[in-house]
């Protein structure tokens, strides 16, 4: 799962651009450049241009994610969810996914909606209603950005929800405010 996402982002952003050599990337990443850290995560995660090393990918994603780099947070969340490069940890996966989702990443929003949906159908008693509302909210937000399958997932959620729950989900989506990312290049 992570490797496909890594390869996607690598092709989208880095494959067409001239690649800085590994030494220059490490230098910039070591100085705290979140984009360089994210780029190293992609390079190590995909094995494109470097030997594939998921532990190194996770290390560099965490460095960038700690600076609120949205895509690094998303990829780190995927790594924790799948246990690739880091020990599998659903709590950490959810934490990093939420951070990316709160910055407006539609993929993270959809993923978070899916995570809440799983709780709504098989979670502890009492958590189902809150999980349904949160799943609906995150699917709705991802659908508003045109993210594939989100609109259908949002609509499917309504079949198991009361009107009040749907209204609450709509209210939460309407009052959602993005978290501002930190740009490491502004320092």
Regions found by a protein language model. Give the residues of each.
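Hydrophobic face of amphipathic alpha-helices that form TPR/SEL1-like repeat modules
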Residues: 39-46, 50, 75-82, 86, ...
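N-terminal segments that cap or nucleate solenoid repeat domains
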Residues: 2-46
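TPR/TPR-like alpha-solenoid signature
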Residues: 38, 74, 95, 110, ...
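Terminal, low-structured helical/coil segments at or just beyond the last alpha-helical repeat
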Residues: 2-17, 149-187
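Short helix-capping/linker turns of helical repeat alpha-solenoids
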Residues: 30-33, 46-48, 53, 66-70, ...
